[in-house]
Amino acid sequence: MEAAFTTGFAEGRDIGAAVAVVVDRQLVVDLWGGHRDRRKTQPWERDTLCCLFSASKGITALCVLQAVAEGKLMLDEPLAEVWPGFGVNGKEAVTLRQVLDHQAGLIGFHEPVSAELLYDWSAVCSALERESPWWEPGTLHGYHARTFGFLLGEALRLATGSTPAGWLADRLAIPHALDLHFGLAGADLDRCAQMVPARVQAGSDATPESSRDLIEAMRDPKTPTGAAFQNPSMGPGYMNSERFRRAEMPAMNGHGTARDLATLYARMPELLPDEVLREATTTQSSGADQVLKSFTRFGLGFMLYDDRAPIGVRPGSFGHAGAGGSMAFYDPDARVGFCFVMNQMQQGVVTGGASAI
């Protein structure tokens, strides 16, 4: 694994990165290297924090599933039972399960919105109350790239009094000594890696074939893909701004280390009852993804292994990938938790160093 990890630097694919493997609760691989800034002046250190992008979704799903296990949220009751203002405009019967498995049809906003919206929890939740589904909930599935975290997070807040940031801190990070966060503050801001965007060239030979349809579809904000990823447009370099790092966007801006996210996945069997974990890792939706324009397979908040969309290395693995190449998963048969994070982003949904390792 060390050879595969260092190859990313030798080939110029990575600027800075970290990878960790936990087996039976024992940390057996813990590698980091390179630099945490584009100019390569600051070394990537043991405690460097990296933006996890959509690998954050697995953390948010765990928070919500713990609330389900405690009877505070119900998978198959209308979300409007805990969020009364939500149950309008075709959303009356939308369930928590449909949000977790990306069948709710609430992938984005029909009308143009400003990036300011995503920094205001109350405002974005009010906007979601006014939205209508892009398809009949439960009939199709499509990746809820940004809305996933707000929809689940508001349900969690109304049912328990905690948003994902609070639940993560109080129930997971602090008790288990995990360096994982939604919303950074103080000295933690100074530990962040600078994310370097991938070069996106639609139709270019440099663009992975699996990503070309996705990149083309992103160009039109009136399509499900464009609405999910480009409405609002966040602007260049947003992921490195202090404002973004301080915000709570539970689908896209978790920060942490590879070591601690691998550890979290390795402890999944302790963190969820068997019956909840079993259901969460059973296929809930699969097939043509209306947003990602490719095959995807989801459990309850987790991506599930499929040879067409590999999360892990074999059937049974579950976890989540993040934009640019990060990935975290648990392999229950081998009892292995894995995580790879990096700051040089690549194109594609599951790509880059994680796939190579």
Predicted regions and their residues:
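Short, gly/Ser/Thr-rich active-site loops of penicillin-recognizing serine hydrolases
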Residues: M249, E270, V276, T281-A288, ...
